[in-house]
A protein has these predicted regions:
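Short beta-strand segments enriched for Tyr within beta-sheet-rich domains
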Residues: 2, 31-39, 102, 114-116, ...
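Alpha/beta-hydrolase fold nucleophile elbow
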Residues: 203-217
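Active-site loop->helix "elbow" adjoining a glycine-rich segment at hydrolase catalytic centers
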Residues: 186, 214-222
């Protein structure tokens, strides 16, 4: 028995004469959706899908496309494209190696004397440092904004907010107090490890006027 699990609903799948499994869901809103398969009671990732870290685990993903209004996050011909690098570094505050995804604008490789402002961009609860560049297509958004003159060329840094596990308050504990500690290890990481590593590795402006932070959902909470 194979179950297709998407957007909080489950749909039983059927096997066709060619041996392929198929199912029909209710209409889905445009945008990106995580999904899972359940095979005889065991939740698995679709082996035919690229995997994405979401909902606190690896998941399949599908995109219900928007019309032309979604062009802002799609790669466009004639637009110079930046790079997203996977950067491993040692975080002394946590005594562990960590990974940051770092976007550099297209001109970074050729304008070798220029320094750049930095945006630290955080993902939502249950996701990781790859969320903005894989699911969110941040690099295409930045490329297009820069090409249109709507954004200054900048470096964008995405790191794990240490919120990969579901938030569960301990019995008898104040929920708001417990929530304030969720992902709190990241605060030491960004101040003591991540920012120093980025400023040492990339051509950045190192003053506070050229450094910003933003985030989605729990990443927004961490920003505040």
């Amino acid at each position: 028995k194979v179950i297709f699990d998407i957007c909080g609903k489950q749909y039983e799948m059927k096997k066709d004469l060619d041996g392929d499994w198929y199912g029909v869901s209710d209409p889905l809103v445009v945008g990106f959706h995580y999904y899972f398969l359940n095979v005889d009671g065991v939740q698995v990732v679709d082996p035919a899908s690229e995997t994405y870290f979401g909902c606190c685990r690896e998941a399949g993903g599908l995109e219900v496309p928007e019309g032309a209004e979604g062009n802002y996050y799609r790669p466009q011909q004639g637009v110079a494209h930046g790079q997203v690098r996977s950067v491993s570094y040692y975080a002394g505050s946590q005594k562990q190696f960590r990974r940051a995804m770092v976007y550099t604008p297209a001109e970074y490789e050729t304008n070798t004397t220029k320094r750049y402002p930095v945006l630290y961009l955080q993902h939502g609860m249950g996701e990781d440092e790859t969320g903005w560049s894989k699911q969110g297509m941040m690099q295409h958004i930045m490329d297009n904004l820069i090409a249109e003159g709507k954004a200054e060329p900048m470096i964008v840094v995405m790191e794990s907010g240490d919120v990969k596990k579901p938030f569960v308050a301990r019995p008898g504990k104040n929920v708001d107090e417990e929530r304030s500690h969720y992902g709190a290890s990241f605060y030491d990481v960004i101040i003591k490890d991540l920012i120093p590593m980025v400023d040492k590795t990339f051509r950045t402006y190192t003053d506070r006027e050229h450094r910003a932070m933003a985030g989605l959902s729990w990443g927004g909470c961490q920003t505040f």
